[in-house]
Amino acid sequence: QGFLNGFIDLIAAGKNGRVCVIDYKSNHLGSRLADYGQAAMSEAVSEHHYYLQALIYAVATARYLKQRRALPESIHVRYLFVRGLNPHGQEGLWCWDIPVSALQEWLE
C-alpha cells in the first residue's frame, strides 16, 4: 500500500546479453584501501539494507527488460564504493549475481 522512490545509477548491457545494475555508494568505511575489502563492504551492505535495495533494483530491471527483450539468466548487481575503488584490485567493488529464476514470483 506504499510507494518506493529510488534511482538506479546505471544499467549496462553487454553484447553477450549480460546485464549489470550499477549503484555508486559514497559510504566512508575508512581511509585505507584495505578498509574497502569484501568483509567491510558486506557489513555495510547488510547494515544499510543494501541487499533489499539490490533485490528491488534487480526486480525492477527484470520487469523492464521482460517487456523489451529476452531475460538474462542473472542480473549482476555491482555496488561501487567510490571512496575505495582500486583499479588494480577488488577493493571498493561489491558483487551479487542474482538468478532471474529467483525473481520469478515478482515478475508475474
Task: Indicate where each model-derived feature is located.
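Structural signature of nuclease core domains in nucleic-acid processing machines
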Residues: 1-108
